[in-house]
């Protein structure tokens, strides 16, 4: 017997009269399609997983359910997959030095453009379109383009076909014409940054082929990731 009560954005769960723990719900103002969950259970019993999340999904208006986990959280991962969740996205975080770099320095001519220019605005449009495309099937952007642009750095590297928003040591957003032309472009960006800094950082989602091309220029065997699990409605 599964007993679920809901209070202050938190589901309290008991099984056969014994408290199992809680699952907190929260929302993301920029991605409002899914209902977000944070798991805090004492016991991840896979035999109750399917019934539990079906009940939660019904309560939350049949929205897709989304959970973010570290790839190291194996017990929670087994629990979610037992309920029908699917890993839809892996996000890899990088802090790298020249010693991690596997490629040559690119020879592409780079322009550095700043906020307030026409080319910067074109870059904003390109990266917004790209972001929408690669995340559409997971958790679509539901806020305005203006809101998205507020989070972009003020400086862009470009060769007029490929774009990298950069803030100090961080490559924050990338997009490109295609993977091949992006390769030589991003090699030039990496070379430029390593001339300025000992270390650079970036994130790469495996749903984004352009960002993964950036990641492929560095060593990352068996790298841990932040994984997005989704239970479709």
Regions found by a protein language model. Name each.
Residues 1-6, 97-117:
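Conserved N-terminal entry element of GNAT/NAT acetyltransferase domains
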Residues 1-55, 154-186:
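Conserved donor-binding loop and adjoining core beta-sheet/short helix segment
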Residues 2-4, 8, 84-87, 151-153, ...:
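Short glycine-aromatic motifs
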Residues 1, 41, 56-60, 83, ...:
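Hydrophobic, Leu/Ile/Phe/Ala-enriched alpha-helical segments that form helix-helix packing faces
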Residues 44-108, 185-193, 198-233:
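Acyl-donor-binding surface of acyltransferase catalytic domains
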Residues 15, 80, 115, 147-148, ...:
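Structural motif
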Residues 107-173:
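Flexible, substrate/cofactor-facing loop regions flanked by secondary structure
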């Amino acid at each position: 017997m599964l007993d679920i009560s809901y209070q202050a954005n938190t589901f309290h769960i008991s099984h056969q009269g014994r408290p199992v723990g809680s699952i907190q719900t929260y929302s993301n103002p920029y991605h409002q399609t899914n209902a977000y969950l944070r798991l805090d259970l004492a016991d991840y019993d896979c035999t109750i997983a399917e019934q539990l999340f079906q009940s939660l999904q019904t309560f939350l208006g049949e929205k897709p359910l989304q959970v973010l986990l570290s790839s190291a959280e194996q017990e929670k991962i087994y629990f979610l997959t037992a309920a029908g969740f699917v890993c839809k996205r892996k996000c890899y975080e990088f802090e790298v030095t020249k010693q991690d770099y596997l490629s040559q320095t690119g020879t592409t001519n780079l322009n550095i453009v700043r906020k307030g220019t026409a080319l910067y605005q074109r870059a904003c449009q390109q990266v917004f379109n790209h972001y929408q495309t690669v995340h559409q099937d997971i958790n679509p952007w539901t806020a305005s383009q203006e809101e998205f642009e507020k989070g972009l750095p003020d400086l862009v590297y470009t060769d007029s076909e490929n774009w990298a928003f950069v803030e100090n040591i961080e490559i924050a957003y990338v997009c490109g014409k295609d993977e091949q032309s992006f390769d030589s472009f991003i090699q030039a960006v990496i070379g430029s940054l390593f001339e300025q800094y000992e270390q650079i950082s970036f994130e790469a989602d495996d749903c984004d082929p352009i960002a993964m091309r950036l990641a492929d220029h560095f060593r990352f065997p068996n790298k841990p990731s932040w994984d997005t699990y989704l239970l479709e409605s």
